[in-house]
A protein has these predicted regions:
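Solvent-exposed, non-transmembrane loop/terminal regulatory segments of multi-pass membrane proteins
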Residues: 34-79, 85-86, 135, 139-156, ...
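Interfacial helix-loop-helix hairpins and adjacent transmembrane helices
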Residues: 1-23, 321, 369-405
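Interfacial segments of transmembrane alpha-helices in multi-pass membrane proteins
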Residues: 226-279, 347-351
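Extracytoplasmic
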Residues: 58, 62, 86, 132-251
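Transmembrane helices with small-residue packing motifs
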Residues: 19-20, 24-52, 74, 347-352, ...
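Helix-loop junctions and hydrophobic alpha-helical segments within the transmembrane domains
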Residues: 309-336
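Membrane-water interface of transmembrane alpha-helices in multipass transporters/channels
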Residues: 44-48, 250-260, 275-291, 345-363
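Transmembrane alpha-helices and their membrane-interface boundaries in multi-pass membrane transporters
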Residues: 274, 295-304, 328-347, 352-394
């Protein structure tokens, strides 16, 4: 096996520019594939197409329509004041008129119910069109609100501080309708953004509105991840650089592993983009962090072995060939075991777990290929130097002999 890797090492040294240009070409192809990445944070994206939960949900939608709501919880000292009721009505109307998938509104200012009177039955609104300003009129509205059990403690809290504004949504279109490539916004996220835009208006501040519902939570999740991901990746890169500086004490030993990690991530995500594989934003960081950890480990092994051989021989190209020969199989074995372990995620019947399995295992194998090709190719550049006579005479360094013992 080592002889086979030695031949690969000689090929890399002879065609180092081919290796580097090939890596750059694959990296460019990966970057291009990123434009086709499909981010889908819908809860339905967690299930496989034949999952019983998803099938039952589709049956429900076929009968009742969309099961998602855009909801707002208001929180004020007293809901039953003229000013607050007017704001709730205005908020309800704006949500119904402005949101793309609005269907039916339910709020304290929109509910009608039947009451008995001398003439039989009549249908009245809890909050009349002309909201009274006097205490008696407002007290009557409060009495009516708590008269019906399906309103009391469900739509309005006992103390009158909180109330729900619920907007039922029309069915969201299929992915083939809204997805037009990079920049396409899923209907869930669009609904969440529209709701956020409405409740953040200054005029609704007295209500202290809080957005609720899966579409709103999905959009907030995307915003949070978009804000935190650069921070986490920046911290990961910084820590990687610190570790590499201490481990390699070389510019190439720092730059190449970082490029390896970024390259494997871009290539694997680009491949998933070409395949139009749906990606959950909450899972995107896992393959990235793993790729950095694996890239640092593999490249430190390769670089450290090369440095010892280079000090022993003084011949840069010979040191590269020996490095690929001796380190190719151990690193490959490590990569294959990690690859096989990560593929076990495919046995879990959840789409995000499949993404983790495919993305992480692909990143590991790409990291291996880059570590045993690009790193040696980069290390082969430079001048030879006089071998270290002490290491040459001893046949290796102090640590080498200790490890062999």
């Amino acid at each position: 096996i080592n002889s086979w890797f030695a031949l690969r090492g000689e090929w890399i040294v002879k065609r180092r520019w081919v290796v580097i240009i090939g890596f750059i070409a694959l990296l460019a192809a990966g970057f291009y594939g990123l434009r086709f990445m499909k981010i889908n944070d819908s809860w339905e994206s967690y299930f496989l197409e034949d999952d019983p939960v998803l099938l039952k949900t589709e049956e429900f939608k076929a009968v009742f329509g969309n099961d998602n709501y855009a909801a707002v919880m208001t929180d004020c000292d007293n809901t039953f004041t003229k000013e607050n009721l007017e704001l709730i009505r205005e908020l309800s109307n704006e949500m119904l008129d402005s949101m793309s998938y609005a269907d039916k509104m339910t709020s304290i200012t929109d509910i009608e119910f039947m009451i008995g009177n001398e003439e039989g039955m009549s249908i009245e609104q809890i909050v009349p069109e002309e909201i009274p300003a006097d205490e008696a009129g407002l007290a009557e509205i409060r009495r009516k609100a708590f008269l019906k059990p399906y309103i009391a403690n469900r739509l309005v809290s006992k103390d009158g501080r909180n109330t729900w504004v619920l907007l039922k949504l029309r069915p969201f279109p299929d992915d083939s309708v809204w997805y037009k490539g990079k920049g396409s916004v899923p209907p869930e996220n669009l609904t969440g953004r529209e709701l956020e835009h409405i409740i953040r208006k200054d005029k609704y501040k007295p209500l202290n509105p809080k957005g609720m519902g899966l579409p709103y939570i999905t959009d907030q999740k995307m915003k949070w991840i978009g804000k935190e991901m650069p921070r986490i990746m920046g911290l990961a890169i910084l820590l990687a650089i610190v570790v590499l500086i201490f481990a390699t004490r070389s510019l190439r030993g720092v730059v190449v592993p970082v490029v390896t990690a970024i390259g494997s991530i871009v290539m694997s995500y680009g491949m998933l983009g070409y395949l139009r594989f749906s990606i959950d934003s909450g899972m995107m960081l896992i393959p990235m962090l793993l790729a950095f950890a694996v890239a640092i480990a593999y490249n430190i092994h390769v670089h450290s072995f090369f440095r010892r051989r280079f000090r022993m021989y003084g011949n840069r190209r010979q040191a590269v060939v020996d490095t690929v020969s001796e380190m190719g199989w151990p690193v490959l074995f490590s990569a294959l075991t990690t690859f096989a372990a990560l593929l076990s995620f495919l046995t879990i019947p959840a789409t995000p777990m499949h993404f983790i399995g495919i993305a992480t295992s692909t990143s590991v194998m790409l990291t291996f290929l880059i570590a045993v090709t690009v790193m040696p190719a980069v290390l082969s550049f430079g001048k030879d130097r006089q071998p270290d006579p002490k290491i040459q005479a001893a046949g290796g360094g102090w640590l080498d002999h200790r490890l062999e013992a």
